[in-house]
Amino acid sequence: MKNILKKQILWAIPLAFSLLTSSCSDYLDKLPENTVEVEGIDYTNKSNMYMPVSGVYATARGYLGSWSSYGCIIVRGDDVNKGGSPTDQIEYEYASKFQYDRLTTFWALSGLWGNCYYVVSTSNSALESLENYAKHLTSESDKQLNAQYAAEVRFFRAYAYFQLVNLFGDVPLLLDNQELNVFKNTKEDVKKYIYDELDYCIANLPAIRPNESEHPGAVTKYTADM
């Protein structure tokens, strides 16, 4: 009986180890949920060409509309007052008076920087995908649609830089996600870049109202021309 039990244990140990390592491998060998798979994408399937554009809209909605970041911008004009007591969220009081030296550790300002560059990074990836789709397009209508989609993405990238340059002045101008050596560009260069991007958007976006778009609410020529 003892020998039988010993044999069963010796047989069970490697089996259990095999199952354990196999299940762990299956569990761990997965792409992170926030990772977009770039291998194996069929860029000849033009029906999927809008997918990277849709991702930029989702990113812009989540990262450019933050109340905390937006507050840093609007309190600097005459449209909105901070309100509340003088000590309530006093950082917005500093922002309204352009006292940026007192905002170096303000979490909302740091968040706006990160949010805008996340939109830039997402836009760069989307534009790279659109370029890959464009290589396989043959009809003029499809090429025009590809240019329109690129214009939608470039609008959001330009808008992110509009926020950055207005709050920080000189900022790095990143036009792709491959750049390793990053340096600040002058405020004048960034603003010229924004104007050039908007010119491209105006030339390639449809002259319709947003509710008339194939994707209702999408940016149009009039959005870029405002």
What residues fall within each predicted segment?
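Short linear capping/connector segments at secondary-structure termini
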Residues: 34-38, 139-143, 173-180
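Membrane-proximal, proline-rich intrinsically disordered regions
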Residues: 24-75
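Secondary-structure boundary/capping residues
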Residues: 33, 65, 69, 135, ...
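Short, surface-exposed recognition loops and adjoining beta-strand edges that mediate ligand/DNA contacts
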Residues: 39-43, 47, 67-87, 205-226
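Conserved, well-structured interaction surfaces
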Residues: 46-54, 58-63, 87-168, 180-192, ...
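Acidic side chains
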Residues: 29, 78-82, 88, 170, ...
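Bacterial Sec-dependent N-terminal signal peptides
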Residues: 1-33
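Short, well-structured active-site flanking segments
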Residues: 30-31, 165-175
